[in-house]
Amino acid sequence: MEFKMDHQNFNVADLDKSIAFYQEALGLHEVRRNEAADGSYKIVYMSNEVSNFQLELTWMRDHPQKYDLGECEFHLAFRVDDYPAAYEKH
């Protein structure tokens, strides 16, 4: 069974500022975007040509203030070649 790291999520208070930072600091660019129909969230995935790993930036309309360390959820995602076997293992 093979696990592959897929993406890392960070919640951000200012999506445009965060996108600009990762573009400038790491040379990442937007590869896809998902926005709620009601405008409650926006999710932007960023990457580069060096790796398939993606950075996921999540903006939540109802959380305009800066995030405190440890306050928000985050996740590290993996892709697996045999999901039923991975589920059984874990």
What is each PLM-predicted segment?
Residues 50-53, 62-64, 83-84:
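Short, charged/polar surface micro-motifs in flexible loops or helix N-caps
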Residues 13-16, 69-90:
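Vicinal oxygen chelate
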Residues 1-2, 68-70:
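Short, flexible turn/loop "capping" segments at secondary-structure junctions
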Residues 2, 9-52:
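Core segments of cupin and vicinal oxygen chelate
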Residues 33, 58-60:
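Conserved beta-strand termini and adjacent loop/short-helix elements that scaffold enzyme active sites
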Residues 57, 66-69:
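Helix-adjacent hinge/juxtasegments
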